[in-house]
């Protein structure tokens, strides 16, 4: 017992020394050109143009013909979702997609919010911009940039947007009313893909910062999960004076002494200040971290090395694309869904919502360019980019959803984000928080902004 206390005290001192070395620095803003060919000498067109999602008979006919040629491989007996997407359940998805899913109706739903495009660094950047339908007298809306990840899209935010822009109509306080901007990452959905190598999270952060200033915002809030978390983090590192607050539901925590401490075992976890909830979500460590990462990172290795190869297959087969993406919406929502014959997909999402996200990738042909984002960010290795070793010095809020791929305790988050002012253990939910639990996420964003406004 005494030995454990002494060791824990020594570890605590080392951790305190490590955490207290707060060096405030900013990420260089830089510039870039990602369009085809050389950057033209003429000034880039900075106009903002309305955009509408459209479809055609030819597009739908081609989709149906490809779906009709779906060739299923029988799953192994009792395999459920342990081998990936179960082809027996895929038959149900395919039948619904072919016979009941109404893409024209879904296009109308996509167009319920105003869409725009604008040229930034040689690329046509797509975004939706939703203003409050009503405001309390004498109040102005708070601008909020929300950034998606992979294999999601701007559509993930469709259910949370009204809770932020029109809270009173949805039973929430109108103390904070937001003006929401949701861009598509370059190479995702309706944003043009780069013609050149190297467009990573830092370049995306700069592009989205330019978008916000082009829209007239000098100070704003930002929120993200998955790649959106890293993009927003980079923006906070790059232009901290413009970011009023950063809210995340996933953290890219660089390897540090602190993140290694759970290896000491569950008993030391309590000595080191981990809460009971942290211990519940981290242990058994081998199963919940090591084995989980091994099971769920196969796609990452492919996309961070040779994304174009698998992309050839996915861009040619809508059913293959659906299997590849929807498997993530199963396991990343809750890992236990691997035990179910249908992957639990319809427990949290409708088939319409899931297929709209697939259709955004399919109709734009952007699965390959979206996968390349892994190569651009991870292809050179880990801890080789300047931003990975930098801390973030803007007010930060964090939503810890219990079924996220890897739990990030408050102590880990605070190492990277010393100005963490809000950390919430969420009641339920997984990786696709805005899509799965929009009300819970909206409430936590509002809680964080209330604290950030006092800073």
UniProtKB/Swiss-Prot annotation:
The chain crosses the membrane at residues 1-21. It is found in: Microsome membrane; Endoplasmic reticulum membrane. Keywords: Acetylation, Aromatic hydrocarbons catabolism, Detoxification, Endoplasmic reticulum, Hydrolase, Lipid metabolism, Membrane, Methylation, Microsome, Signal-anchor, Transmembrane, Transmembrane helix. Its EC number is 3.3.2.9. Residues 22-455 are cytoplasmic. Changing residue 410 to A: Slight decrease in catalytic activity. Biotransformation enzyme that catalyzes the hydrolysis of arene and aliphatic epoxides to less reactive and more water soluble dihydrodiols by the trans addition of water. May play a role in the metabolism of endogenous lipids such as epoxide-containing fatty acids. Metabolizes the abundant endocannabinoid 2-arachidonoylglycerol (2-AG) to free arachidonic acid (AA) and glycerol. Binds 20(S)-hydroxycholesterol (20(S)-OHC). This is Epoxide hydrolase 1. It comes from Rattus norvegicus.
């Amino acid at each position: 017992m005494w030995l454990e206390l002494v060791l824990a005290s020594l570890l605590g001192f080392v951790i305190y020394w490590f955490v207290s070395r707060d060096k405030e620095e900013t990420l260089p803003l830089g510039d870039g050109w990602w369009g085809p060919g050389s950057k033209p000498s003429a000034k880039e067109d900075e106009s903002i143009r309305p955009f509408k999602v459209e479809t055609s008979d030819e597009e739908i006919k081609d989709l149906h013909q490809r779906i009709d040629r779906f060739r299923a491989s029988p799953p192994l007996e009792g395999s459920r979702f342990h081998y990936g997407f179960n082809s027996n359940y895929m038959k149900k998805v395919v039948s619904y997609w072919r016979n009941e899913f109404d893409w024209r109706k879904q296009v109308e739903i996509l167009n319920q919010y105003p869409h725009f495009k604008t040229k930034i660094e040689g690329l046509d950047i797509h975004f939706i911009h939703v203003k409050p339908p009503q405001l309390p007298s004498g109040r102005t809306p708070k601008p909020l940039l929300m950034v998606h990840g992979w294999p999601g899209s701007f559509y993930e935010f469709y259910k949370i947007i009204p809770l932020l822009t029109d809270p009173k109509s949805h039973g929430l306080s109108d103390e904070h009313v937001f003006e929401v901007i949701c861009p598509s990452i370059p190479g995702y959905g309706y944003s043009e893909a780069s013609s050149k190598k190297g467009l990573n999270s830092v370049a995306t952060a700069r592009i989205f910062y330019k978008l916000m200033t082009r829209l007239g915002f000098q100070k704003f809030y930002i929120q993200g999960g998955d790649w959106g978390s890293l993009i927003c983090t980079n923006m906070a590192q790059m232009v901290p004076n413009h970011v009023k607050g950063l809210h995340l539901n996933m953290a890219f925590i660089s390897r540090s002494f602190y993140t290694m401490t759970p290896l000491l075992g569950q008993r030391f976890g309590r000595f080191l200040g981990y809460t009971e909830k942290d211990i519940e979500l981290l242990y058994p460590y081998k199963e919940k971290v090591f084995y989980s990462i091994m099971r769920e990172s196969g796609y990452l290795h492919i996309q961070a090395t040779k994304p174009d190869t698998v992309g050839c297959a996915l861009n040619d087969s809508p059913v293959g694309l659906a299997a590849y993406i929807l498997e993530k919406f199963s396991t990343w929502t809750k890992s236990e869904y691997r035990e179910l014959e249908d992957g639990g997909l319809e427990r949290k999402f409708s088939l319409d919502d899931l297929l709209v996200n697939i259709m955004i990738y399919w109709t734009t042909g952007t699965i390959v360019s979206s996968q390349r984002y892994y190569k651009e960010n991870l292809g050179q290795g880990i801890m080789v980019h300047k931003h990975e070793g930098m801390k973030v010095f803007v007010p930060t809020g964090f939503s810890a959803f219990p079924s996220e791929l890897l739990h990030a305790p408050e102590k880990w988050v605070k190492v990277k984000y010393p100005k963490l002012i809000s950390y919430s253990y969420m009641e339920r939910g997984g990786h696709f928080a805005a899509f799965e639990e929009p009300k819970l996420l909206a409430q936590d964003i509002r809680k964080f902004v209330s604290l950030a406004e006092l800073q």
